[in-house]
From Swiss-Prot:
It comes from the Bacteria. One of its GO terms (molecular function) is ATP binding. It comes from Thermosynechococcus vestitus (strain NIES-2133 / IAM M-273 / BP-1). Homodimer. ATP binds at Q6, P7, T8, G14, N15, G142, E143, D144, V185, K194, M195, S196, K197, S198. A motif ('KMSKS' region) lies at residues 194-198. The lineage of its organism: Bacteria, Bacillati, Cyanobacteriota, Cyanophyceae, Acaryochloridales. This is Tryptophan--tRNA ligase. One of its GO terms (biological process) is tryptophanyl-tRNA aminoacylation. PROSITE patterns: AA_TRNA_LIGASE_I. Belongs to the class-I aminoacyl-tRNA synthetase family. It is found in: Cytoplasm. It holds the Pfam family tRNA-synt_1b. The keyword Protein biosynthesis applies.
Amino acid sequence: MLSGVQPTGSLHLGNYLGAIRNWVAGQAEYENYFCVVDLHAITVPHDPAELAANTYTVAALYLACGIDPAHATIFVQSHVSAHAELTWLLNCITPLNWLEDMIQFKEKAVKQGENVAAGLLDYPVLMAADILLYDADLVPVGEDQKQHLELTRDIAARVNYLFARNQPPILKLPEPLIPKAGARVMSLTDGTKKMSKSDPSELSRINLLDSPDEIRKKIKRCKTDPIRGLAFDDPDRPEANNLLSLYQVLTGKTKEAVAAECADMGWGQFKPLLTDAVIATLEPIQQRYNEIMADPSYLKDLLKKGQEQAATVANATLERVKLAFGFTLP
């Protein structure tokens, strides 16, 4: 299994509940590669100092959230040069219109206007290289990444067709791993939008490193409605559904139990319950994070070991592809 998070902005509850917690739950079942995808982070304008600091923060949060180095290889994408090299090879056989049709590119290109970089168009090919280098069987994806995984499969199939027709395939076609729960945590300021690091409002998300006071402030100010009594699945009350679902996932209670508990509540009663659940979830993560960051050499050594382990696998795949393309090897 392979997955990763960009070191841009702060990791938030959506990243944890929608992705990282699921990685932790399944890590003993798979051979895992968890990457800090810093090459993806520079496809939009970025601050170099923040990128460097956030790279270590994300790696430390992987560990603090429960990723076990005994069950996973943790590494930084740019530390393994095969990612960039395979991306170029895949670029040369990927039709341009495949990339122009990607929904995320269209959305982000509109925001950037004339300043849109070629790297943003090429983002899905880099993602394909990330996945294909490790012969990944499963890739955890949310709804917003399904199209990128489909493109990865198309690119792998094209390589196999062009260079290994009637022969064993060169690249493995990965399958999506869609989480059963917690897959979509919504914004605190708009229950119809996904919680996002890129949202300009800090009030829209709860970051994994937010203090208890910051958490209380954000939940106190989060968008609600004037209706007393809280219920799931009312299309006219997206915020109620979002906050109840968040409470359910954090407490581990059943949907039916939460519905019964909160049926007659007002927001003034419910928000302290949600606040306590968030703080209780994040407290051990923050404690472990602080311990890791207090020992920088441990984190750097772990990432160096991860780079070596990842490069061994990635370079073997890259060599296989280069030979298929007709390159000579040194």
